[in-house]
Amino acid sequence: MGLIARVRKEWFIIGIVLVITFAKLQPSVGVKGGPLHPEITITYVAVSVIFFNSGLSLKTEELASALMHVKLHFFVQTFTLVFFPIAIWLLLKVLALTAINEWLLRGLQTVACMPPPVSSAVILTKAVGGNEAAAIFNSAFGSFLGIVVTPLLLLVFLGSSSSVPFTSIFSQLFMTVVVPLIVGQVCRRFLRECLDRRKPPFGAVSSVVLLMIIYSTFCDTFNNPNIELDHLSLLTVVFIIFSIQLSFMALIFFLSTRKSSGFSAADSVAIMFCATHKSLTLGIPMLKIVFEGYEHLSLISVPLLIYHPAQILLGSVLLPSIKTWMSGRQKTLTPI
């Protein structure tokens, strides 16, 4: 395979390296209030584009079918909002015996209490040919559910509570997730024949938007002065976060691919991404609300700032392997 062909095939991985490098060199460009204005372009425009794109590309019957997949939805929401925080709480009982900063450990617990994101899990699921409709439903439903459940979980595990502006957060989710999805579906009704004939690069569009989200996320990470902890603490937290993600992804893969689970290969991919990913977009504002006035808020936020880009990086690196597994699974199930 020639160099140009290799670049075309691996353009997304190359793009990740480039945007992270640029974020490191010029983090001020992609932070809130910077030239990119991510508080608008990422929070509203990028997320809206992702779900409009999904609405335009998804067959209505597939989305309707996903809504009825109750077993899958129950599995995802139970794992991410019940099993995840309890498992991390038990892990932190052990880690509390070490020299790791107490507030960083509390930050890990806040990560566990967060809802799934409304973008990355959908894009990664779509990129490998997983059950995109199920990923969309669980990302949106989990985000709405998390607005109520996450503050309660933080109260239970960390003893912190505050009045949460449910109305404004629900409104934002409705406008950036539900409305674009519906508009995309309506447009598809009128453009179905054209879309089926031309086959627009929906996956490439979503991948470009994801690169924007990665860039903005790393700009925030590199621009945050509170990230400058000692190297050992940072490396320890990064190692713990990647270990948690890999362990939980492996656990979900094992549970969802058993014959008795009743899930297809496409379902397993959607479950794996939706149940292990956590929302930075909802998480950071929620932490600022729930922990308002906390002297150590910045330290509590560090694990979430690391977890979000880590989940996107890990998912992106695993894409080729998951694609290969999906192809092999489909060939096995295809009758000769």
From Swiss-Prot:
Q: Where in the cell is it found?
A: Cell membrane; Endoplasmic reticulum membrane; Golgi apparatus membrane
Instruction: List, in alphabetical order, the Gene Ontology terms for molecular function in this entry.
Output: symporter activity
Keyword line: Cell membrane, Endoplasmic reticulum, Golgi apparatus, Ion transport, Membrane, Sodium, Sodium transport, Symport, Transmembrane, Transmembrane helix, Transport
In terms of domain of life, where is this protein from? Answer: Eukaryota
Query: Biological process (GO) annotations?
Result: bone mineralization; cartilage development; sodium ion transport
Q: How does it sit in the membrane?
A: Multi-pass membrane protein
The keyword Nuclease belongs to this UniProt entry's keyword annotation: no
> Where would you find the membrane-spanning parts of this chain?
11-31, 38-58, 72-92, 117-137, 139-159, 164-184, 202-222, 234-254, 271-291, 299-319
Q: Which GO terms describe its cellular component?
A: endoplasmic reticulum membrane; Golgi membrane; plasma membrane
Fetch the Gene3D superfamilies from UniProt: 1.20.1530.20
Effect of loss of the gene: Morphants have reduced head and eyes, a curled body, tooth cartilage that is bent downwards, reduced Meckel cartilage, absence of the fourth ceratobranchial cartilage, shortened or absent palate cartilage, widened palatal skeleton, reduced cleithrum, notochord, and lack of bone mineralization.
* Main subcellular localisation: membrane
**Is Cell membrane set as a keyword in this record?**
yes
Extracellular side of the membrane: what ranges?
Answer: 32-37, 93-116, 160-163, 223-233, 292-298
- Residue ranges in the Cytoplasmic topological domain are 1-10, 59-71, 138, 185-201, 255-270, 320-336
The entry assigns this protein to a family as follows: Belongs to the bile acid:sodium symporter (BASS) (TC 2.A.28) family.
Protein purpose: Involved in teeth and skeletal development. Has an essential role in the biosynthesis and trafficking of glycosaminoglycans and glycoproteins to produce a proper functioning extracellular matrix. Required for extracellular matrix mineralization. Also involved in the regulation of cellular calcium homeostasis. Does not show transport activity towards bile acids or steroid sulfates.
PANTHER family in UniProt: SODIUM_BILE ACID COTRANSPORTER 7, SOLUTE CARRIER FAMILY 10 MEMBER 7
- Could you tell me what this protein is called? Sodium/bile acid cotransporter 7
